[in-house]
Amino acid sequence: MAQRAFPNPYADYNKSLAEGYFDSAGRLTPEFSQRLNNKIRELLQQMERGLKSADPRDSTVYTGWAGIAVLYLHLYDVFGDPNYLQMAHGYVKQSLNSLSKHSITFLCGDGGPLAVAAVVHHKMNNEKQAEECITRLIHLNKIDPHAPSEMLYGRMGYISALLFVNKNFGEEKIPQSHIQQICETVLTSGEDLARKRRFTGKTPLMYEWYQEYYVGAAHGLAGIYYYLMQPSLQVSHAKLHNLVKPSVDYVCQLKFPSGNYPPCVDDSRDLLIHWCHGAPGVIYMLTQAYKVFKEERYLNDAYQCADVIWQYGLLKKGYGLCHGTAGNAYAFLSLYSLTQDAKYLYRACKFAEWCLDYGEHGCRTPDTPFSLFEGMAGTIYFLADLLVPTKARFPAFEL
């Protein structure tokens, strides 16, 4: 872990240190808000220049044009500037011109561009176009009957696109029956694989991606279980307690002494502190388990995640969401939202302060340096989210 991160130079929380960032009610100080706003404007200009050389055919939310649309949609929600909505419209239109026709998910498939387009059209009062996008999104389910179950390329990634639409419309545009049908397929496939690979003595559910049993949020168990525990999926009480809870407990048993988690089952290397692999993604499963099952041990494990992220979360890989400092900071905001403990808001502010020196630490340059999940767009999204900390949610994942 240590060799993949910069040493954390910041003192941990105390009340007097935090006063430079927010007041006792958790409202950011005008000075810190201004610093965030200035950086958002500066990075947006850099990003727009950089996007001129981006891949014109990448339609995805993860690294492509739909991700830039998600950023501008978010900026519109935060600042209310209609120019941001127009920018979102332009970018999502570009993404719809180059759909993959084979992947269905929100982050890496056609589900993302269609879901984002539906929401953008809805906010622009283009209800006919919004309905067309929703119809196409619902029909995507037929494209890949053999999809895995994980977030980036699988069924949960499709479900996240459906929930994104319902959340932003404030009503059930995607029928609950459609969502539950896919959810049942995820549960059944997890039971089948656990039996087939003889995991049933340890866990009633198991999932794989490319013959690996991944643990983290992007490809693995933590991301799948986080969604299965969401009230909006309406998993039955019996299945929550008999299938999901013992499967969550199995993931908890994989924890390293550091408080971190392995990238895969049976991987003993304690290396990665990323949203995609490790504690910064597993923490969402733990906080959701605490909300649903009311057992203190899940919250204690989440606190351990936060501590290891604070120590090793300023990543040499960069400032992005998937495997960068901004993505790691969202773990603190998630805990702050749950507990209202000012320590976690302070830690998020300090990671944001690191991001205010974007490009000055000698981090490696991502393959897609201006994208939402690997690059600058994700950092801008985080800095804007931090302006109203209680509303902050990890984009395209956290509900």
Curated annotation (Swiss-Prot):
It is found in: Cytoplasm; Cell membrane. The modification N6-acetyllysine is found at K142. Zn(2+) binds at C276, C322, H323. Its EC number is 2.5.1.18. It is an enzyme of class 2 (transferase). It is a peripheral membrane protein. One of its GO terms (cellular component) is plasma membrane. Keywords: Acetylation, Cell membrane, Cytoplasm, Membrane, Metal-binding, Transferase, Zinc. Glutathione binds at K317, R364, T365, P366, D367. Interacts with the C-terminal of STOM. Interacts with the EPS8 SH3 domain. Interaction with EPS8 is inhibited by glutathione binding. Belongs to the LanC-like protein family. Functions as a glutathione transferase. Catalyzes conjugation of the glutathione (GSH) to artificial substrates 1-chloro-2,4-dinitrobenzene (CDNB) and p-nitrophenyl acetate. Mitigates neuronal oxidative stress during normal postnatal development and in response to oxidative stresses probably through GSH antioxidant defense mechanism. May play a role in EPS8 signaling. Binds glutathione. This is Glutathione S-transferase LANCL1. It comes from Bos taurus (Bovine). The gene is LANCL1.
